[in-house]
Amino acid sequence: VKSKMLAAFTAVTLVALLVAGCATPAAEPEPTTPPPAAEATATPEPEPEPEMGTTYKIGFGPDVTGGGANLGEPQRNWAEIMKERLEESGGIVGPDGVVHEVEIIVGDSESNPDVAASLARRYVDEDEVVALIMGSVTPISLAIAEVATEAEVPYISMASSLAIIADPDTGEMRPWVFKVAQSNGDVAQWQVERLTDLGVNSVCYMYENTGYGKDCYNNSSAALTDAGMENMFEGAFERTDTEFPQVPAIEAAGCDAVVIGAIPPGAANAHLAIRTALPDIPIIHGHGVCTTDFITAGGDAVESAEMPCSAVIIAEDIAADNPAKATWMDFKDAYEDYTGEPVSTFGGHAYDALYWVIEALETLPEGLSLAEQRAAVRDYIENNITDWPGTAGIFKLAPDDHYGLDYTSFTWFKVEGQKFVPFPEEEW
Protein backbone atom coordinates (compact mmCIF):
# COMPACT_ATOMS: atom_id res chain seq x y z
CA VAL A 1 0.00 0.00 0.00
CA LYS A 2 2.77 2.29 0.91
CA SER A 3 4.54 1.47 -2.48
CA LYS A 4 1.32 2.27 -4.41
CA MET A 5 0.87 5.62 -2.57
CA LEU A 6 4.52 6.52 -3.25
CA ALA A 7 4.18 5.64 -6.93
CA ALA A 8 1.03 7.78 -7.12
CA PHE A 9 2.70 10.67 -5.33
CA THR A 10 5.73 10.42 -7.62
CA ALA A 11 3.55 10.44 -10.71
CA VAL A 12 1.59 13.50 -9.52
CA THR A 13 4.80 15.28 -8.70
CA LEU A 14 6.27 14.60 -12.14
CA VAL A 15 3.13 15.91 -13.84
CA ALA A 16 3.22 19.08 -11.73
CA LEU A 17 6.83 19.70 -12.62
CA LEU A 18 6.15 19.22 -16.33
CA VAL A 19 3.24 21.72 -16.20
CA ALA A 20 5.30 24.26 -14.34
CA GLY A 21 8.11 23.96 -16.83
CA CYS A 22 5.83 24.74 -19.75
CA ALA A 23 4.26 27.83 -18.15
CA THR A 24 5.27 31.43 -19.26
CA PRO A 25 7.43 33.11 -16.66
CA ALA A 26 5.69 35.92 -14.75
CA ALA A 27 6.72 39.46 -15.84
CA GLU A 28 8.77 41.48 -13.45
CA PRO A 29 6.65 44.28 -11.99
CA GLU A 30 7.58 47.76 -13.34
CA PRO A 31 8.49 50.31 -10.79
CA THR A 32 5.70 52.78 -10.01
CA THR A 33 6.30 56.27 -11.44
CA PRO A 34 5.14 58.97 -9.06
CA PRO A 35 2.76 61.65 -10.51
CA PRO A 36 4.41 64.91 -11.47
CA ALA A 37 4.53 67.38 -8.67
CA ALA A 38 1.87 70.07 -8.92
CA GLU A 39 3.21 73.42 -10.02
CA ALA A 40 3.22 75.91 -7.24
CA THR A 41 0.35 78.42 -7.71
CA ALA A 42 1.03 81.92 -6.54
CA THR A 43 -1.62 83.34 -4.22
CA PRO A 44 -3.30 86.16 -6.19
CA GLU A 45 -2.71 89.58 -4.79
CA PRO A 46 -5.99 91.26 -3.81
CA GLU A 47 -6.86 94.19 -6.02
CA PRO A 48 -6.04 97.41 -4.22
CA GLU A 49 -8.95 99.45 -3.01
CA PRO A 50 -9.49 102.48 -5.27
CA GLU A 51 -8.10 105.68 -3.87
CA MET A 52 -10.97 107.81 -2.62
CA GLY A 53 -10.75 111.55 -3.01
CA THR A 54 -12.77 114.61 -2.16
CA THR A 55 -16.55 114.28 -2.10
CA TYR A 56 -18.01 116.79 -4.53
CA LYS A 57 -21.27 118.48 -3.56
CA ILE A 58 -23.83 120.05 -5.89
CA GLY A 59 -26.50 122.40 -4.54
CA PHE A 60 -29.75 121.59 -6.33
CA GLY A 61 -32.77 123.79 -5.62
CA PRO A 62 -35.73 123.78 -8.03
CA ASP A 63 -39.09 125.36 -7.22
CA VAL A 64 -40.80 122.26 -5.85
CA THR A 65 -43.58 124.28 -4.22
CA GLY A 66 -45.26 127.57 -5.05
CA GLY A 67 -46.06 128.99 -8.46
CA GLY A 68 -43.21 127.21 -10.26
CA ALA A 69 -43.99 123.75 -8.90
CA ASN A 70 -45.19 122.41 -12.26
CA LEU A 71 -41.63 122.96 -13.47
CA GLY A 72 -39.75 122.25 -10.26
CA GLU A 73 -41.29 118.88 -9.42
CA PRO A 74 -40.05 117.19 -12.63
CA GLN A 75 -36.64 118.72 -12.01
CA ARG A 76 -36.56 117.35 -8.47
CA ASN A 77 -37.59 113.95 -9.87
CA TRP A 78 -34.58 113.89 -12.17
CA ALA A 79 -32.23 114.84 -9.33
CA GLU A 80 -33.45 111.80 -7.40
CA ILE A 81 -32.83 109.58 -10.44
CA MET A 82 -29.34 111.04 -10.76
CA LYS A 83 -28.59 110.36 -7.11
CA GLU A 84 -29.47 106.70 -7.68
CA ARG A 85 -27.24 106.53 -10.76
CA LEU A 86 -24.29 107.99 -8.88
CA GLU A 87 -24.78 105.61 -5.97
CA GLU A 88 -24.95 102.58 -8.27
CA SER A 89 -21.78 103.63 -10.10
CA GLY A 90 -19.87 104.29 -6.90
CA GLY A 91 -19.14 107.87 -7.88
CA ILE A 92 -16.96 109.30 -10.63
CA VAL A 93 -13.30 108.77 -11.53
CA GLY A 94 -10.97 111.71 -12.06
CA PRO A 95 -8.18 111.86 -14.64
CA ASP A 96 -5.71 110.59 -12.01
CA GLY A 97 -7.77 107.48 -11.22
CA VAL A 98 -9.01 108.86 -7.92
CA VAL A 99 -12.67 108.04 -7.15
CA HIS A 100 -14.96 110.79 -5.92
CA GLU A 101 -18.42 110.48 -4.45
CA VAL A 102 -20.87 113.10 -5.69
CA GLU A 103 -23.55 114.35 -3.33
CA ILE A 104 -26.55 116.15 -4.81
CA ILE A 105 -28.12 118.20 -2.02
CA VAL A 106 -31.77 118.70 -2.97
CA GLY A 107 -33.70 121.65 -1.57
CA ASP A 108 -36.74 123.74 -2.49
CA SER A 109 -36.55 127.36 -3.62
CA GLU A 110 -40.32 127.56 -2.98
CA SER A 111 -40.82 129.90 -5.98
CA ASN A 112 -39.66 132.68 -3.65
CA PRO A 113 -36.62 134.84 -4.48
CA ASP A 114 -35.73 135.42 -0.82
CA VAL A 115 -35.95 131.72 0.03
CA ALA A 116 -33.92 130.88 -3.08
CA ALA A 117 -31.16 133.36 -2.25
CA SER A 118 -30.98 132.10 1.34
CA LEU A 119 -30.79 128.48 0.16
CA ALA A 120 -28.05 129.37 -2.32
CA ARG A 121 -26.00 131.06 0.41
CA ARG A 122 -26.36 127.99 2.64
CA TYR A 123 -25.20 125.74 -0.18
CA VAL A 124 -22.20 127.98 -0.84
CA ASP A 125 -21.10 128.82 2.71
CA GLU A 126 -22.15 125.83 4.82
CA ASP A 127 -22.34 122.89 2.41
CA GLU A 128 -19.38 124.13 0.36
CA VAL A 129 -20.86 123.01 -2.95
CA VAL A 130 -18.77 123.07 -6.09
CA ALA A 131 -21.73 124.24 -8.23
CA LEU A 132 -25.32 125.46 -7.99
CA ILE A 133 -28.23 124.19 -10.11
CA MET A 134 -31.30 126.15 -9.08
CA GLY A 135 -34.21 128.26 -10.25
CA SER A 136 -37.11 126.86 -12.26
CA VAL A 137 -38.41 130.31 -13.18
CA THR A 138 -36.81 133.63 -14.07
CA PRO A 139 -37.25 135.80 -10.93
CA ILE A 140 -35.88 133.03 -8.73
CA SER A 141 -32.94 132.54 -11.06
CA LEU A 142 -32.10 136.25 -11.05
CA ALA A 143 -31.91 136.24 -7.25
CA ILE A 144 -29.59 133.23 -7.26
CA ALA A 145 -27.40 134.73 -10.00
CA GLU A 146 -26.46 137.57 -7.66
CA VAL A 147 -25.39 135.14 -4.93
CA ALA A 148 -23.40 132.97 -7.34
CA THR A 149 -21.65 135.95 -8.91
CA GLU A 150 -20.64 137.39 -5.55
CA ALA A 151 -19.39 134.01 -4.26
CA GLU A 152 -17.77 133.02 -7.58
CA VAL A 153 -19.57 129.69 -7.78
CA PRO A 154 -20.68 128.26 -11.15
CA TYR A 155 -24.46 128.46 -11.39
CA ILE A 156 -26.77 126.82 -13.94
CA SER A 157 -30.34 128.12 -14.13
CA MET A 158 -33.23 125.99 -15.38
CA ALA A 159 -35.27 129.04 -16.46
CA SER A 160 -35.52 130.72 -19.85
CA SER A 161 -34.79 134.45 -19.76
CA LEU A 162 -31.53 135.64 -21.31
CA ALA A 163 -31.41 138.29 -18.56
CA ILE A 164 -30.34 135.50 -16.21
CA ILE A 165 -27.01 135.02 -17.99
CA ALA A 166 -26.44 138.44 -19.60
CA ASP A 167 -26.27 141.88 -18.06
CA PRO A 168 -29.38 143.64 -19.43
CA ASP A 169 -27.49 146.94 -19.76
CA THR A 170 -24.29 145.75 -21.45
CA GLY A 171 -25.31 142.39 -22.88
CA GLU A 172 -22.11 140.87 -21.48
CA MET A 173 -22.22 137.35 -20.08
CA ARG A 174 -22.28 136.99 -16.31
CA PRO A 175 -19.05 135.00 -15.85
CA TRP A 176 -20.39 132.48 -13.34
CA VAL A 177 -23.94 132.03 -14.68
CA PHE A 178 -25.26 129.62 -17.33
CA LYS A 179 -28.68 128.32 -18.34
CA VAL A 180 -30.09 125.22 -20.01
CA ALA A 181 -33.71 126.13 -20.85
CA GLN A 182 -34.55 127.45 -24.33
CA SER A 183 -34.98 131.22 -24.57
CA ASN A 184 -38.15 133.17 -25.22
CA GLY A 185 -36.45 134.97 -28.10
CA ASP A 186 -36.26 131.64 -29.93
CA VAL A 187 -39.91 131.01 -29.08
CA ALA A 188 -40.80 134.38 -30.60
CA GLN A 189 -39.12 133.49 -33.88
CA TRP A 190 -41.29 130.39 -34.17
CA GLN A 191 -44.42 132.38 -33.29
CA VAL A 192 -43.67 134.91 -36.02
CA GLU A 193 -43.22 132.17 -38.62
CA ARG A 194 -46.45 130.41 -37.65
CA LEU A 195 -48.58 133.56 -37.45
CA THR A 196 -47.16 134.81 -40.74
CA ASP A 197 -48.15 131.53 -42.35
CA LEU A 198 -51.67 131.98 -40.96
CA GLY A 199 -51.90 135.42 -42.56
CA VAL A 200 -52.23 137.17 -39.21
CA ASN A 201 -51.98 140.98 -39.25
CA SER A 202 -52.86 141.75 -35.64
CA VAL A 203 -52.49 140.00 -32.29
CA CYS A 204 -53.68 140.25 -28.71
CA TYR A 205 -51.20 139.24 -26.02
CA MET A 206 -51.89 137.74 -22.59
CA TYR A 207 -49.10 136.96 -20.15
CA GLU A 208 -48.66 135.96 -16.53
CA ASN A 209 -47.50 138.67 -14.16
CA THR A 210 -44.08 137.14 -13.44
CA GLY A 211 -40.56 137.57 -14.71
CA TYR A 212 -41.16 134.68 -17.09
CA GLY A 213 -44.42 136.13 -18.42
CA LYS A 214 -42.93 139.57 -18.92
CA ASP A 215 -39.95 138.10 -20.73
CA CYS A 216 -42.34 136.18 -22.99
CA TYR A 217 -44.22 139.36 -23.76
CA ASN A 218 -41.13 141.51 -24.33
CA ASN A 219 -39.60 139.04 -26.77
CA SER A 220 -42.78 138.10 -28.63
CA SER A 221 -44.25 141.59 -28.93
CA ALA A 222 -40.97 142.95 -30.29
CA ALA A 223 -40.62 140.15 -32.83
CA LEU A 224 -44.25 140.36 -33.93
CA THR A 225 -44.03 144.14 -34.33
CA ASP A 226 -40.85 143.79 -36.38
CA ALA A 227 -42.73 141.33 -38.59
CA GLY A 228 -45.42 143.96 -39.25
CA MET A 229 -48.14 142.62 -36.94
CA GLU A 230 -50.10 145.13 -34.89
CA ASN A 231 -50.43 144.54 -31.15
CA MET A 232 -54.12 145.27 -30.52
CA PHE A 233 -54.17 144.42 -26.80
CA GLU A 234 -51.89 143.34 -23.97
CA GLY A 235 -52.94 142.19 -20.53
CA ALA A 236 -51.32 140.54 -17.52
CA PHE A 237 -52.86 138.04 -15.12
CA GLU A 238 -51.74 136.13 -12.04
CA ARG A 239 -50.59 132.56 -12.47
CA THR A 240 -53.38 131.25 -10.24
CA ASP A 241 -56.21 133.31 -11.79
CA THR A 242 -59.38 131.55 -12.89
CA GLU A 243 -61.34 134.67 -13.90
CA PHE A 244 -60.13 136.84 -16.78
CA PRO A 245 -61.73 140.28 -17.14
CA GLN A 246 -59.32 140.94 -20.03
CA VAL A 247 -61.31 138.69 -22.36
CA PRO A 248 -64.03 141.25 -23.28
CA ALA A 249 -61.26 143.67 -24.28
CA ILE A 250 -59.77 140.99 -26.53
CA GLU A 251 -63.18 140.46 -28.12
CA ALA A 252 -63.56 144.19 -28.68
CA ALA A 253 -60.06 144.54 -30.13
CA GLY A 254 -60.88 142.27 -33.05
CA CYS A 255 -57.37 140.81 -33.32
CA ASP A 256 -56.62 137.92 -35.68
CA ALA A 257 -54.89 135.69 -33.10
CA VAL A 258 -54.05 135.49 -29.40
CA VAL A 259 -50.60 134.75 -27.99
CA ILE A 260 -50.25 133.60 -24.36
CA GLY A 261 -47.03 133.70 -22.37
CA ALA A 262 -47.52 131.62 -19.23
CA ILE A 263 -47.14 128.23 -17.58
CA PRO A 264 -49.90 126.01 -16.13
CA PRO A 265 -52.28 126.41 -14.50
CA GLY A 266 -52.60 130.04 -15.60
CA ALA A 267 -51.86 129.27 -19.25
CA ALA A 268 -54.61 126.65 -19.39
CA ASN A 269 -57.12 128.81 -17.52
CA ALA A 270 -56.50 131.81 -19.79
CA HIS A 271 -56.78 129.60 -22.86
CA LEU A 272 -60.11 128.22 -21.63
CA ALA A 273 -61.52 131.70 -21.02
CA ILE A 274 -60.49 132.96 -24.46
CA ARG A 275 -61.64 129.82 -26.26
CA THR A 276 -65.05 130.05 -24.56
CA ALA A 277 -65.53 133.61 -25.77
CA LEU A 278 -63.85 133.22 -29.17
CA PRO A 279 -64.20 129.59 -30.28
CA ASP A 280 -62.51 130.05 -33.66
CA ILE A 281 -59.58 132.38 -32.96
CA PRO A 282 -56.07 130.86 -33.24
CA ILE A 283 -54.30 130.67 -29.85
CA ILE A 284 -50.60 129.95 -29.60
CA HIS A 285 -48.31 129.62 -26.59
CA GLY A 286 -44.67 129.56 -25.58
CA HIS A 287 -42.71 126.55 -24.38
CA GLY A 288 -43.93 126.98 -20.81
CA VAL A 289 -46.90 124.76 -21.63
CA CYS A 290 -44.89 121.76 -22.86
CA THR A 291 -46.13 119.59 -20.02
CA THR A 292 -49.07 117.26 -19.59
CA ASP A 293 -50.23 119.54 -16.74
CA PHE A 294 -51.34 121.99 -19.43
CA ILE A 295 -53.50 119.38 -21.17
CA THR A 296 -54.83 118.00 -17.88
CA ALA A 297 -55.83 121.47 -16.67
CA GLY A 298 -57.28 122.63 -20.00
CA GLY A 299 -59.00 119.46 -21.18
CA ASP A 300 -60.90 119.71 -24.45
CA ALA A 301 -60.56 123.50 -24.46
CA VAL A 302 -56.85 123.29 -25.33
CA GLU A 303 -57.41 121.05 -28.37
CA SER A 304 -55.72 122.76 -31.36
CA ALA A 305 -53.46 124.88 -29.12
CA GLU A 306 -50.04 125.31 -30.73
CA MET A 307 -46.58 125.82 -29.23
CA PRO A 308 -42.85 125.14 -29.72
CA CYS A 309 -41.39 122.34 -27.56
CA SER A 310 -38.31 120.17 -27.37
CA ALA A 311 -38.75 116.98 -29.39
CA VAL A 312 -37.73 114.95 -26.33
CA ILE A 313 -41.43 114.45 -25.63
CA ILE A 314 -41.65 112.29 -28.77
CA ALA A 315 -38.14 110.83 -28.53
CA GLU A 316 -39.12 107.35 -29.71
CA ASP A 317 -40.38 108.77 -33.01
CA ILE A 318 -37.17 110.65 -33.82
CA ALA A 319 -34.84 109.24 -36.50
CA ALA A 320 -32.04 107.04 -35.16
CA ASP A 321 -29.36 109.19 -36.79
CA ASN A 322 -30.41 112.30 -34.85
CA PRO A 323 -27.39 113.17 -32.65
CA ALA A 324 -29.65 113.78 -29.63
CA LYS A 325 -31.68 110.57 -30.00
CA ALA A 326 -29.66 108.53 -27.48
CA THR A 327 -29.81 111.33 -24.91
CA TRP A 328 -33.54 111.80 -25.38
CA MET A 329 -34.24 108.09 -25.00
CA ASP A 330 -31.99 107.79 -21.94
CA PHE A 331 -33.81 110.66 -20.25
CA LYS A 332 -37.31 109.69 -21.36
CA ASP A 333 -37.05 106.01 -20.43
CA ALA A 334 -35.46 106.68 -17.04
CA TYR A 335 -37.90 109.47 -16.16
CA GLU A 336 -41.00 107.53 -17.11
CA ASP A 337 -39.77 104.37 -15.36
CA TYR A 338 -39.09 106.31 -12.16
CA THR A 339 -42.22 108.47 -12.06
CA GLY A 340 -44.78 106.43 -13.96
CA GLU A 341 -45.68 109.69 -15.70
CA PRO A 342 -45.08 111.07 -19.20
CA VAL A 343 -41.72 112.70 -19.74
CA SER A 344 -41.39 116.39 -18.89
CA THR A 345 -39.23 118.83 -20.83
CA PHE A 346 -38.67 120.67 -17.55
CA GLY A 347 -37.15 117.58 -15.99
CA GLY A 348 -34.87 117.55 -19.01
CA HIS A 349 -33.36 120.86 -17.90
CA ALA A 350 -32.19 119.13 -14.71
CA TYR A 351 -30.75 116.28 -16.80
CA ASP A 352 -28.69 118.66 -18.92
CA ALA A 353 -27.47 120.80 -16.02
CA LEU A 354 -26.43 117.89 -13.82
CA TYR A 355 -24.54 116.15 -16.60
CA TRP A 356 -22.71 119.38 -17.44
CA VAL A 357 -21.41 119.52 -13.88
CA ILE A 358 -20.67 115.78 -13.63
CA GLU A 359 -18.71 115.90 -16.89
CA ALA A 360 -16.72 118.86 -15.61
CA LEU A 361 -15.99 117.16 -12.27
CA GLU A 362 -14.57 114.13 -14.07
CA THR A 363 -11.75 116.34 -15.36
CA LEU A 364 -10.59 117.58 -11.95
CA PRO A 365 -7.45 116.10 -10.39
CA GLU A 366 -7.40 115.43 -6.67
CA GLY A 367 -5.83 118.11 -4.52
CA LEU A 368 -7.54 121.25 -5.78
CA SER A 369 -8.90 123.75 -3.29
CA LEU A 370 -12.64 124.44 -3.29
CA ALA A 371 -12.08 127.75 -5.08
CA GLU A 372 -9.97 125.99 -7.71
CA GLN A 373 -12.63 123.30 -8.17
CA ARG A 374 -15.33 125.92 -8.69
CA ALA A 375 -13.23 127.85 -11.19
CA ALA A 376 -12.32 124.68 -13.10
CA VAL A 377 -15.98 123.63 -13.38
CA ARG A 378 -16.90 127.10 -14.64
CA ASP A 379 -14.11 127.03 -17.22
CA TYR A 380 -14.99 123.54 -18.42
CA ILE A 381 -18.66 124.36 -18.98
CA GLU A 382 -17.87 127.56 -20.84
CA ASN A 383 -15.25 126.02 -23.12
CA ASN A 384 -16.17 122.34 -23.52
CA ILE A 385 -19.96 122.08 -23.72
CA THR A 386 -19.88 122.32 -27.51
CA ASP A 387 -21.82 120.15 -29.94
CA TRP A 388 -23.20 118.62 -26.76
CA PRO A 389 -26.46 116.66 -27.25
CA GLY A 390 -28.87 117.54 -24.47
CA THR A 391 -32.59 117.14 -23.92
CA ALA A 392 -33.15 120.75 -25.05
CA GLY A 393 -31.04 120.47 -28.20
CA ILE A 394 -27.41 120.53 -29.31
CA PHE A 395 -25.61 122.97 -27.01
CA LYS A 396 -22.72 125.09 -28.29
CA LEU A 397 -21.54 127.23 -25.40
CA ALA A 398 -18.79 129.83 -25.69
CA PRO A 399 -17.33 132.64 -23.58
CA ASP A 400 -19.81 135.03 -25.21
CA ASP A 401 -22.76 132.60 -25.06
CA HIS A 402 -23.64 130.84 -21.79
CA TYR A 403 -26.79 129.36 -23.35
CA GLY A 404 -25.70 127.78 -26.61
CA LEU A 405 -29.01 127.02 -28.35
CA ASP A 406 -31.09 128.70 -31.06
CA TYR A 407 -34.61 128.41 -32.41
CA THR A 408 -33.79 125.14 -34.21
CA SER A 409 -33.78 123.44 -30.81
CA PHE A 410 -37.59 123.59 -30.95
CA THR A 411 -40.16 121.56 -32.85
CA TRP A 412 -43.61 123.04 -33.48
CA PHE A 413 -46.44 121.08 -31.83
CA LYS A 414 -50.19 121.14 -31.50
CA VAL A 415 -52.54 119.49 -29.03
CA GLU A 416 -54.54 116.80 -30.76
CA GLY A 417 -56.48 114.02 -29.05
CA GLN A 418 -55.19 115.29 -25.68
CA LYS A 419 -51.58 114.70 -26.75
CA PHE A 420 -48.71 116.80 -28.04
CA VAL A 421 -48.41 116.01 -31.74
CA PRO A 422 -45.65 117.33 -34.03
CA PHE A 423 -46.96 119.91 -36.48
CA PRO A 424 -44.08 120.57 -38.91
CA GLU A 425 -44.02 123.53 -41.27
CA GLU A 426 -44.74 121.39 -44.31
CA GLU A 427 -48.13 120.54 -42.76
CA TRP A 428 -49.09 124.16 -42.04
Descriptions of predicted regions:
Residues 52, 59-82, 107-113, 136-137, ...:
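Extracytoplasmic "Venus flytrap"
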Residues 115-118, 163-164, 174-278, 349:
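Extracellular/periplasmic Venus flytrap/periplasmic-binding protein
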Residues 17, 21-49:
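Ser/Thr-rich, Proline-interspersed low-complexity disordered segments
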Residues 334-347, 358-422:
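Segments of small-molecule ligand-sensing domains
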